[in-house]
């Protein structure tokens, strides 16, 4: 039914309509697109939390993956007046992870930064390796007061009170956490005042699972 709604709204948008009717169709387009995205996120969240997603672990170069996702989001970061600062560890630090799922984790975190980071500030993306553990860290200053504990931010549908007018389902961090843990990794958030930090860690050799 949702696909039919989206398709019919798309057909309406191509008709010659009075100005007031066209504005209504534009609202329908935006809201149906948001509903479609929410439905997709719900399906993904359900699959991730139940482990109903195939996982293929292999040595994954975090530096390459992090550089690629930063490149993908360069224009969007510029549009939000955010300055990316990329800091990579020594070459050769590979995580045992599923590259496809890890990309989805990083994509969710980047999307979160674009929505909630304060314009005109720097956002930090770092990779590090120590003690057989490889880690990716995202840091940004929030444009909204972080009035909620870090652990609650990872609950489904939870967003800060003042951010509810922004785009998004409130599922991004929950999905990122589930997908990370599905690969045997660790996902945690840290909040210090308005500083928001997301930390994703994986074993370098793949011999053990991590726990937050």
What are these regions (language model features)?
Residues 184-185:
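Conserved glycine-rich
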Residues 56-74:
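A conserved beta-strand-to-alpha-helix junction within the catalytic ATP-binding
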Residues 30-35:
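Short alpha-helical segment of the dimerization/phosphotransfer core of two-component systems
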Residues 145-158:
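Short conserved segment of the HATPase_c
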Residues 50-55, 94-97:
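Conserved micro-motifs of the catalytic ATP-binding
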Residues 56-59, 78, 83-93:
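Conserved catalytic submotifs in the C-terminal HATPase_c
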Residues 113-114:
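Short helix-loop "hinge" at the ATP-lid/N-box region of the Bergerat-fold HATPase_c
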